[in-house]
From Swiss-Prot:
PANTHER family: LEUCINE--TRNA LIGASE, CYTOPLASMIC, LEUCYL-TRNA SYNTHETASE. A motif ('HIGH' region) lies at residues 35-45. GO terms for cellular component: cytoplasm. This is Leucine--tRNA ligase 2. It catalyses: tRNA(Leu) + L-leucine + ATP = L-leucyl-tRNA(Leu) + AMP + diphosphate. It is found in: Cytoplasm. The lineage of its organism: Archaea, Thermoproteota, Thermoprotei, Sulfolobales, Sulfolobaceae. One of its GO terms (biological process) is leucyl-tRNA aminoacylation. Keywords: Aminoacyl-tRNA synthetase, ATP-binding, Cytoplasm, Ligase, Nucleotide-binding, Protein biosynthesis. It comes from the Archaea. Its EC number is 6.1.1.4. The keyword Ligase applies. A motif ('KMSKS' region) lies at residues 619-623. HAMAP family: Leu_tRNA_synth_A.
Length: 942
């Protein structure tokens, strides 16, 4: 920690990462999602921020003028909800604050004040960011409740309103039933986005009232042969518009937020309902009401139709209850028949509800994608035959749409909304429901014009990893209206309706633009009242007259123009870093809002999305008590070890697994490099032989590889080269020079290690600074240039030559492992050079899909011995590895010369002094029944 603290102070004192426009340098503007300061950072937070910082440091070394700013997100309910929990004495939360985050009691008592909490955790998070080594320009820091930022958000929302992208409407939203506010991802525990989906209710008449069965598959109603209810749950008989309906008591409470005038008349037990029957409104058939424990009273209405031909649960439980009910098929799947659910249940023999859930997903997926409707006209009421005849032979998706329209238009049912990923809990602890919100302000992400702009933007964005692009395209397709304001929480009031506060996922979409001039607002001590709509209109879009704006605002015109210039220097944003959980909300809104407000040349250029962090293979959670505070982890292992551990043992889009053993292995690796630098002065050798040529080639090829990996943000491959492959190259170099009985070349090692420290710097900046100064440098390696790509130092022939030596070594060691006597000497018989040409031709023939006869036609064997050898060479060409293929196809060489270069190495590694290289023609065929093939010499041990 002493090393890291030393260099952090050095960076801060020298303002190393403050970014100022420089017309002579290419700019690189990167941001990471600003955090909610409602608790300290833990290891899971660290990955996204360190990933972004590694890339920022790399681009800085590549010669870019890098801007990497940071701010804090106070908006919305997360902070208020957390403060409320503290005020209520939430034992679990307070215990976590005490035992995991080690927050003093006297501080916890003050966390009941939302602003105290936000400011306290802001400083805690900021310190963690500094301790982990983030190269941030802190001059640009702000919070989202700063009045200056609020003026910017007011401008943004007026622009969106002008363009018709903000509407007042009625729409389903996630809703907290206690605080009576819309709920989005950042308002929920675990940051779960409430996913709202549609159920279709179909009205089955009964003498108890209408049973509104809830289904996602209305096209199967023709095959409904029963109605399920849960006999152990309470059911409400409710009145809606003068009619009686029966639904679970829990559903009636939930649906009261969607259905006006829903009035509970009485409550009965589900067991009372099973004494009755109901009538299918489409077929007119009377069906029994059956009790089933698997019916969830909180899903839909707690009333479900039973379609055993197409629902594994239904078939399984009907069979279990020995109900003698016929199965009615309505969907056919080519090659799989008309009773898919029944067939799969009987075939797979499910043991529990989890097995049934998997089968259900399988049946639904297959029938949706491949199913067509059979002739259902013989099943329906006579008066519906003509209207429903067009469903016959329709694919399931089209049939679902048509039957839904038929049901709703005929008054035979209606739609309701459900939280599809329930249970989702508001931060206050209550389960989120769906509410049909009236007269609410929405961002109209369903607007087709806006969707088209977003799609156009997506086409110009570089996505890392590339496959994440399709997820954004999917979001644009399904995204609809989203409530953009709340009546509770911190933030900016809606400018035209100030009882509403703009919510957290709506004021965090273009704030990256605010960074570009945030420090100038402070520098010139501008008042919020000066930051008018016209001011932002000019700074962000260049609209208006700066002289007029200066007169009205009192801001000097040169200051206004300078801020406009600085904005244009940094914008557009080059890359946005975030976790994959923000793809369906924040990151997509980020694309939409930029596309709506800015011209296309200022749209985002890149988005990098990373996976999560596991701890010992498990998700970090309160229940598992495996949350590790980031600052504590830094103290335990050091910042650079944490940086490497969080970013290098998985591809960027996959989850990283952090473990104590992995962190300690990184410590050992870094210590080995430190020890190597300590020993550098002991190496007095000056030879420039084969070992030195090989090491230079491997190292400079590594520089090329690392640069390519870093360009694509492949941190795993980069770090593998820098930390592990390089270590193996150094160790192998030492083996090579030992085999020659001499000292390593200290000068070469110093040159190489100097470059290697630069490669390491983005990943382990504190350790790299320490090593940099240890080798006598007095600059900051963080500000050094990235190594120049120099192909001239890469010698593929030297590299492949040693690969050949190692391959031969492995072959000899394999023979020695089964050799019973003590080996005294080795004879290596090398194939005649002419056979190398045969192998080259064989490789060419194999690559083109040719046959052995073509090789025979080219080289025309002189006898059976040649023909047999050619056949073996052809087989070798089919199996040869890539390295040996490169060697034989790219270079003209004598295999004996190749071996001569590795003779000392082989002797040293095998511990056998007498190794002779001979021509295959010198082999005594009567004594040794072996063939020497090109690159596969015959090995005789004596």
């Amino acid at each position: 920690m002493k090393i890291s603290e030393k260099w952090q102070k050095e960076w801060e004192n020298k303002r190393v990462f403050d970014a100022t426009p420089d017309p002579n340098k290419k700019k690189f503007f990167t941001t990471i999602a600003f955090p909610y300061p409602n608790s300290p950072f833990h290891l899971g937070h660290g990955r996204t921020y360190v990933t972004g910082d590694i890339y920022a440091r790399y681009m800085r070394m590549r010669g870019y003028n890098v801007l990497f700013p940071m701010a804090f997100h106070y908006t919305g309910t997360p902070i208020i909800a957390m403060a409320d929990d503290v005020a209520k004495g939430d034992k679990e939360l307070i215990d976590i604050f005490k035992s995991i985050y080690e927050i003093p009691d006297d501080v916890i008592s003050k966390l009941v004040d939302p602003l105290f909490m936000a400011n306290y955790f802001k400083e805690e998070i900021k310190q963690a960011m500094k301790e982990i080594g983030l190269s941030i320009d802190w001059r640009r820091e702000f919070t989202t409740i700063d009045p200056e930022f609020s003026s910017f958000i007011i401008w943004q929302f007026r622009k969106l309103q002008e363009k018709g992208f903000i509407v007042r409407d009625t729409h389903p939203v996630g809703w907290c039933p206690v605080h009576h506010i819309p709920v989005g991802m950042h308002d929920t525990k675990g940051d779960m986005e409430p996913e709202i989906g549609e159920f279709v209710l179909i009205y089955f008449d009964s003498d108890m009232g209408i049973l509104p069965v809830a289904t996602l598959r209305p096209e199967t109603v023709f095959g409904a042969i029963a109605v399920w209810v849960n006999p152990h749950e309470s059911y409400s008989i409710v009145e809606i518009d003068g009619k009686k309906y029966v639904m679970s008591e829990k559903a009636s409470s939930k649906l009261s937020f969607q259905i006006d005038n829903l009035k509970v008349i009485t409550v009965v037990k589900g067991s009372e309902l099973v004494k009755h029957s109901a009538v299918n409104p489409i077929t007119g058939k009377e069906v029994p009401i059956i009790g089933a424990n698997f019916v969830d009273p909180l899903t839909g209405t707690g009333v479900v139709m039973s379609v055993p031909a197409h629902a594994p649960f239904d078939y399984f439980y009907l069979k279990k209850t020995k109900s003698e009910l016929s199965i009615i098929s309505v969907i056919r799947v080519e090659g799989m028949g008309e009773t898919l659910a029944k067939d799969l249940v009987e075939k797979s023999n499910p043991q529990n509800d989890n097995d049934l859930k998997k089968l259900t997903e399988q049946v639904y997926r297959i029938e949706y994608n491949k199913g067509v409707m059979i002739d259902i006209t013989k099943l329906v009421k006579p008066e519906y035959v003509e209207e429903l005849k067009p469903l016959v032979n329709l694919p399931v998706p089209a049939a679902r749409q048509k039957i839904t329209e038929f049901i709703t238009q005929k008054g035979l049912g209606r739609k309701i909304y459900e939280i599809m990923n329930r249970p989702v809990y508001c931060r206050c602890g209550n389960e989120v429901v769906v509410k049909i919100l009236k007269d609410q302000w929405f961002l109209d992400y369903g607007n087709q014009e806006w969707k088209d702009l977003a799609r156009k933007s997506i086409e110009s964005i570089r996505f890392i990893p590339p496959e994440i692009k399709k997820d954004f395209e999917f979001v644009v397709d399904w995204l609809q209206k989203r409530a953009c304001a709340r009546t509770r929480g911190l933030g900016t009031p809606l400018p035209w309706d100030k009882k509403w506060i703009i919510e957290s996922l709506s004021d965090s979409t273009i704030y990256m633009a605010f960074y570009t001039i945030a420090h100038r607002l402070k520098e010139h001590k501008l008042k919020p009242s000066q930051l008018t709509y016209e001011f932002w209109e000019y700074i962000m879009l260049g609209n208006g007259n700066p002289d007029e704006i200066s007169k009205i605002s009192g801001i000097p015109v040169e200051v206004i123009k300078a801020m406009r210039d600085e904005f244009l220097y940094w914008y557009p944003l080059d890359v946005r870093h975030s976790g994959k959980d923000l793809v369906p909300n924040h990151l997509s809104f980020f694309i939409f809002n930029h596309a709506a407000i800015f011209p296309h040349q200022l749209w985002p250029k890149g988005i990098a999305v990373n996976g999560f962090v596991l701890y010992d293979g498990k998700k970090m959670s309160k229940s598992l008590r495996n949350i590790v505070p980031l600052r504590k982890a830094i103290r335990m292992y050091s910042p650079d070890v944490i940086r490497i551990a969080l970013t290098t043992n998985a591809d960027i889009g996959s989850d990283v697994n952090f473990s104590d053993s992995y962190a300690k292995s990184i410590i050992d690796t870094l210590k080995n490099y430190y020890d190597l630098l300590e020993k550098l002065k002991e190496f007095k050798g000056e030879d420039e032989g084969f070992p030195e040529k090989w090491l230079k080639s491997k190292f400079y090829q590594m520089v090329i590889n690392v640069t390519q990996y870093m360009d694509s943000l492949d941190l795993r491959s980069s770090s593998n080269e820098i930390l592990y492959n390089f270590s193996s190259y150094i160790n192998e170099y030492f083996e090579l020079v030992r085999s020659e009985g001499r000292e390593p070349n200290g000068k070469l090692l110093s040159q190489i290690l100097q470059i290697w420290i630069k490669l390491l710097s983005p990943f382990a900046p504190h350790f790299a600074e320490e090593l940099w100064h240890k080798i006598g440098k007095n600059t900051l390696v963080s500000l050094e240039s990235w190594p120049i790509i120099d192909q001239s130092n890469v010698d593929l022939f030297i590299d492949l030559t040693h690969t050949y030596h190692r391959k031969l070594l492995n072959d000899i060691q394999a023979i020695l492992s089964v050799y019973k006597d003590t080996p005294k000497s080795i004879k290596i018989f090398v194939a005649n050079k002419e056979f190398l040409n045969v192998l080259r031709d064989a490789i060419n023939i194999v690559q083109k899909g040719g046959q052995l006869r073509q090789l025979m036609e080219i080289h025309k064997p002189k006898g059976k011995q040649d023909a047999r050898l050619y056949q073996k060479i052809y087989e070798e060409a089919r199996e040869i590895d890539d390295d040996m293929k490169k060697l034989v196809t790219n270079f003209d060489f004598d295999e004996k010369d190749l071996l001569d270069k590795g003779l000392k190495y082989l002797s040293y590694k095998l511990g056998i002094k007498e190794i002779r290289i001979l021509d295959a023609s010198e082999m005594d065929r009567t004594k040794y029944n072996k063939d020497a093939l090109p690159l596969r010499p015959a090995i005789i041990i004596e």
